[in-house]
C-alpha cells in the first residue's frame, strides 16, 4: 500500500510537522514527537508536514535546505512515520497554506502577533529579523486549520501559537459563520534535556555536541555521550527535576524507550549506581538508533522514492486544502 492509497475517512485529523533546516534529528525529536505520532497513525487521519516554509524565517542555503529536506524525510519515515498510513507532505508544495495565511493575517491583530513569546525571544537575540518570523504563528495557524485538524501535538514552546490558532478560528467563525474546526491541543509532556546541561532542552544547536544524541550517531558516540552525561554526586537513582535534573533526564529517556512509567524505572534501579542505568540506557539507545540509521541509509540510497512519496502526498494534501480555501473564499465573497 502506497501513500497514494491513503483514504481520507471520518477519523479525527491530527497534524504535526518538523522543520528540515537541519539534516539531523535528535532524541528529543524522536521521544518528544515522532514516537507518539507514530502510535496515532491507526486511530487518526494523520498529516505529517515537512515545514520548509517555516525554515525560511532565517537565511538558508538553497541546496543545503533541499538536501536536508530529503534527509529529514528519510529519518522521519525510518523512525516510524509510515507513508502508507500518514500523508507525509512538503509544506511548500501546498500553495493553499500561503493563501489561508493571508486571510488569517487579516483576522489576527498586530498586538496578538507581537505578544508571541517566541517572537519576542528570538527578535531580542537577533539583529535584523524578517517579517516572516513575526507572521510565523499565522502561517502555523493556516497549516492547522487547512486540514480541519481536531488535535495538534504541541510542546510547551508552541502552546501559545496553538492558542492563537484557536482564537483566529473562533473569530472567523463568529464573523462569517461556522467554517473552521477549532483544534484541541494534544499536549506532549515528554521533554528531553541536554546531557551536559539538563536545565535546557536537547537541541540540534546545543552549546556542545556531547549534549545531544542524534538519531544517526554511531554506537560509540552514543555510549560516550550517555556515560559522560551530567548527573550529581549522590549516586541515588530517583526522579526530581529540581534537585536531580541530570539523572531525572536519564530516567525519562529509559521510561520512554521501554514504555515503563517513571515510578517503575526508579524501582527497577533502586539501590543501583548511575553507571548501571547509563549502561542499560546506552544499550537500548544503540539498538534503537542503529535500526533507524540503517533504515535511513536504505531510504537515502533511493532518493527518488522519497521524492515520490512527498509528491504523491502533497497532491493529496492540496486536494483537501483546496476544499477549505473554497469554503473560506465563499464566506469572504472573493469567489
From Swiss-Prot:
Homodimer. PROSITE patterns: AA_TRNA_LIGASE_I. Catalyzes the attachment of tryptophan to tRNA(Trp). It catalyses: tRNA(Trp) + L-tryptophan + ATP = L-tryptophyl-tRNA(Trp) + AMP + diphosphate + H(+). L-tryptophan binds at residue 143. SUPFAM superfamilies: Nucleotidylyl transferase. A motif ('KMSKS' region) lies at residues 201-205. It comes from the Bacteria. This is Tryptophan--tRNA ligase. Its EC number is 6.1.1.2. The lineage of its organism: Bacteria, Bacillati, Actinomycetota, Actinomycetes, Micrococcales. GO terms for biological process: tryptophanyl-tRNA aminoacylation. Belongs to the class-I aminoacyl-tRNA synthetase family. It comes from Tropheryma whipplei (strain TW08/27). The keyword Protein transport does not apply. GO terms for molecular function: ATP binding; tryptophan-tRNA ligase activity. GO terms for cellular component: cytosol. InterPro entries: aa-tRNA-synth_I_CS, aa-tRNA-synth_Ic, Rossmann-like_a/b/a_fold, Trp-tRNA-ligase, Trp-tRNA-ligase_bac-type, Trp-tRNA_synthetase. It is found in: Cytoplasm. ATP binds at residues 19-21, 28-29, 155-157, 192, 201-205. Keywords: Aminoacyl-tRNA synthetase, ATP-binding, Cytoplasm, Ligase, Nucleotide-binding, Protein biosynthesis. Pfam families: tRNA-synt_1b (PF00579).
Amino acid at each position: 500500500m502506497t501513500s497514494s492509497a491513503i483514504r481520507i475517512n471520518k477519523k479525527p485529523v491530527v497534524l504535526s510537522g518538523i522543520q528540515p533546516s537541519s539534516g539531523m534529528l535528535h532524541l528529543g525529536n524522536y521521544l518528544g514527537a515522532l514516537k507518539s505520532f507514530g502510535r496515532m497513525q491507526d486511530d487518526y487521519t494523520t498529516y505529517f508536514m515537512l515545514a520548509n516554509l517555516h525554515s525560511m524565517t532565517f537565511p538558508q542555503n538553497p541546496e543545503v535546505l533541499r538536501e536536508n529536506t530529503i534527509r529529514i524525510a528519510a529519518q522521519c519515515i525510518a523512525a516510524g512515520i509510515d507513508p502508507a498510513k500518514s500523508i507525509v507532505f512538503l509544506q511548500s508544495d501546498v500553495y493553499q497554506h500561503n493563501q489561508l495565511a493571508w486571510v488569517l493575517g487579516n483576522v489576527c491583530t498586530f498586538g496578538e502577533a507581537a505578544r508571541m513569546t517566541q517572537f519576542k525571544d528570538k527578535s531580542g537575540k537577533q539583529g535584523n529579523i524578517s517579517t516572516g518570523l513575526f507572521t510565523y504563528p499565522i502561517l502555523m495557524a493556516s497549516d492547522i486549520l487547512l486540514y480541519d485538524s481536531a488535535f495538534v501535538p504541541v510542546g510547551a514552546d508552541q502552546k501559545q501559537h496553538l492558542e492563537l490558532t484557536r482564537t483566529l478560528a473562533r473569530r472567523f467563525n463568529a464573523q462569517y459563520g461556522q467554517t473552521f474546526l477549532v483544534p484541541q491541543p494534544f499536549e506532549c509532556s515528554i521533554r528531553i534535556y541536554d546531557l551536559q546541561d539538563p536545565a535546557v532542552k536537547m537541541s540540534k544547536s546545543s552549546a556542545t555536541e556531547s549534549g545531544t544524541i542524534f538519531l544517526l550517531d554511531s554506537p560509540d558516540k552514543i555510549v560516550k555521550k550517555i556515560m559522560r552525561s551530567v548527573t550529581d554526586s549522590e549516586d541515588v537513582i530517583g526522579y526530581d527535576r529540581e534537585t536531580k535534573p541530570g539523572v531525572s533526564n536519564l530516567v525519562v529517556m529509559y521510561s520512554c524507550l521501554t514504555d515503563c512509567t517513571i515510578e517503575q524505572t526508579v524501582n527497577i534501579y533502586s539501590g543501583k549506581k548511575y553507571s548501571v542505568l547509563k549502561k542499560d540506557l546506552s544499550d537500548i539507545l544503540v539498538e534503537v538508533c542503529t535500526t533507524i540509521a540503517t533504515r535511513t541509509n536504505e531510504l537515502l540510497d533511493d532518493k527518488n522514492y522519497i521524492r515520490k512519496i512527498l509528491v504523491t502526498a502533497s497532491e493529496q494534501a492540496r486536494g483537501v486544502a483546496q476544499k477549505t480555501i473554497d469554503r473560506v473564499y465563499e464566506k469572504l465573497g472573493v469567489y
